[in-house]
Swiss-Prot record:
Highest taxon of source: Bacteria
Protein family according to the UniProt entry: Belongs to the MukE family.
Gene: mukE
Described purpose of this protein according to its UniProt entry: Involved in chromosome condensation, segregation and cell cycle progression. May participate in facilitating chromosome segregation by condensation DNA from both sides of a centrally located replisome during cell division. Probably acts via its interaction with MukB and MukF.
Taxon lineage: Bacteria, Pseudomonadati, Pseudomonadota, Gammaproteobacteria, Enterobacterales
Species per Swiss-Prot/TrEMBL record: Pectobacterium atrosepticum (strain SCRI 1043 / ATCC BAA-672) (Erwinia carotovora subsp. atroseptica)
Protein's recorded name: Chromosome partition protein MukE
Length: 231
């Protein structure tokens, strides 16, 4: 075993970080210690994970995640259609001027209102109940499902809840996994809006996902670690 790989695997950070990556979590600069570790050992860890038929990816925005190949030896699951739509909306909000105005913080209600304004409400309700009649009960169920999707994306490192207030969150750059492909000269926010309204698929269908048990109640690692840098 190469000396540098042995050093990485024996590091106290590695066991928990490895578990998070295998579970689908995205590691951005918000998790400074883990991010620096991955930067330092990226090359040897790429070789290590290739043995499991997954790729350690460093995205252009700087965050890390594992991308499985079709022959992966690590269990995986796929995000639901609603999860992916919520992810697209989060990416749209990240690109919005409001993110800077609000210091990057949004509320669940703002997310829900943006979702209804940009996507077809009848199609959203069908995701919750195929026989939806557009009743208040159906809308209530949709809002609950959106909260569940948001919590699932939190577990993947896409957002952080603000302290003990789960109604507010900060979006991380990892939401660019849900971003539209932008050609040179195109406006990124407009491209994202087109993808949302056209219902285009986004390229995370092969991504790893955390187990979905207790999504609504799991509050582990809700808040961003303290770092010396703002997002």
């Amino acid at each position: 075993m190469p000396v540098k790989l042995a050093t990485a695997l024996s590091n106290n950070l590695f066991p928990a970080l490895d578990s998070q990556l295998r579970a689908g979590r995205h590691i951005g600069i918000e998790e400074l210690e883990n991010h620096v570790f991955l930067m330092d050992f990226q090359e040897v860890l790429e070789e290590f994970y290739s043995r499991y038929n997954v790729e350690l990816i460093r995205a252009p925005e700087g965050f890390f995640y594992l991308r499985p190949r079709s022959t992966t030896l690590i269990p995986r699951s796929v995000l639901s259609e609603l999860d992916m739509m919520v992810g697209k909306i989060l990416c749209y909000l990240y690109l919005s001027p409001e993110r800077l105005a609000h210091e990057g913080i949004f509320s669940q209600q703002e997310l829900y209102e943006e979702l209804l304004s940009l996507a077809d409400e009848s199609k959203l309700l069908k995701l919750v109940n195929q026989r939806s009649t557009g009743s208040d009960l159906d809308r209530q169920k949709l809002q609950e499902k959106v909260r569940t999707s948001l919590n699932r994306l939190r577990r993947l490192g896409m957002i952080y809840f603000m302290g003990n207030d789960s109604s507010k969150f900060r979006i991380t750059e990892s939401v660019f996994r849900f971003g539209a492909d932008v050609r040179s000269g195109d406006d990124a926010r407009e491209a994202q809006l087109r993808m949302i309204r056209d219902g285009e698929a986004m390229p995370v269908e092969g991504s790893l996902s955390l187990k979905d048990d207790s999504d609504d109640n799991d509050r582990t690692d809700d808040t961003a670690p303290e770092t010396g840098e703002d997002e």
